[in-house]
Design a protein with these regions (language model features):
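Short beta-strand micro-motifs within the conserved protein kinase catalytic domain, predominantly
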Residues: 48-58
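Conserved kinase catalytic-core helix
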Residues: 31-46, 66-110, 125-140, 144-153
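Short, polar/flexible loop-turn hinges at active-site or ligand-entry regions and domain interfaces
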Residues: 22-25, 68-75, 96, 171-173, ...
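Conserved short submotifs of the Hanks-type protein kinase catalytic core
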Residues: 57-68
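ATP-binding glycine-rich loop module of kinase domains
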Residues: 2-30
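Active-site acidic catalytic loop and adjacent metal/ATP-binding pocket
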Residues: 2-6, 134-177
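Active-site activation/catalytic loop segments of kinase-like enzymes and analogous catalytic loops
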Residues: 178-213, 226-241
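Active-site ExK catalytic segment of metal-dependent nucleases
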Residues: 15-21, 64, 166-168
């Protein structure tokens, strides 16, 4: 994938993503659909779709820029991060049977993916899946939009307002707050360079997520988030092995 920045003098006008991969072209379609969906739901501070097309063997996706000259990348979760995600969730949340949600589909996918893992690892993941299912199966849940890659490098803060971009991995019916956990974990790994699980857990216990939601809820959404990440990497590894 190649990303071309389009600008006029010092003003960034937008970005055009280009790829000769059909898989990446599919991700362009997903991001385009998700951006248009969010706009219909009343979400601003996100890129606008300019065009999405295929020509010969290339896929093109052009979108406006949310970055301004004074915008800053923030590596901590601020009130603006909380407010953006809360607004996005409230405007997209739907009440549905758990089994009809994107998150339930994720768990079904994960149960298939773990069959190739060592027995001990597979059993640990299956136990977590069963805990989530026990709580939600057969019940109505209220799930909303999940960005999928909510990180410091996909967000920008300017004049007290948070803008967000790169929605290609988004899902529409997921539990609330998982994006916050992703932001926390990605910052620990790639900014703080912290890989020790014990230290990450200690930091999580001191985070605004733990403080605002309480320990029980913070641990619950961490488990829900880890199921998403494990499935992502297992499914990606399987696809690569088949190529």
């Amino acid at each position: 994938k190649v990303v071309i920045q389009i600008y006029n003098k010092a003003k960034i006008l937008g970005y055009c993503k280009i790829s000769d991969s059909k898989k990446v072209g599919f991700l362009f379609d997903c991001e385009c659909d998700n951006l248009e969906y969010l706009y219909k739901c009343g979400i601003d501070s996100i890129p606008k779709v300019i065009f999405r097309c295929d020509k010969e063997n290339l896929s093109f996706f052009c979108q406006s820029s949310v970055k301004k000259s004074k915008g800053k990348t923030i590596e901590v979760i601020t009130e603006q991060h909380w407010n953006f995600l809360k607004n996005m969730y409230e405007k997209t949340a739907k009440e549905m049977k758990f089994e009809k949600s994107d998150y339930s589909a994720l768990l079904e996918s994960l149960e298939k993916e773990i069959k190739g893992l060592p027995k001990e690892d597979a059993e640990s993941i299956q136990k977590a899946v069963m805990l989530i299912r026990k709580k939600n199966e057969g019940k109505l849940v209220k799930y909303g939009f999940y960005h999928g890659d909510f990180t410091p490098w996909n967000t920008v803060l300017e004049s007290g307002k948070l803008s967000v971009f790169d929605f290609e991995y988004a899902k529409r019916t997921y539990p609330e707050y998982l994006d916050l956990v992703h932001f926390f974990m990605q910052t620990k790994f790639f900014v703080d360079k912290e890989m020790r699980s014990s230290e990450i857990y200690l930091s999580y216990g001191k985070s605004s997520i733990w403080e605002k939601l309480g320990g029980k809820k913070a641990l619950e959404i961490m488990i829900e988030y880890l199921m998403e990440v494990i499935n992502l990497y297992l499914s990606r590894a399987e696809k690569e092995s088949m190529e």
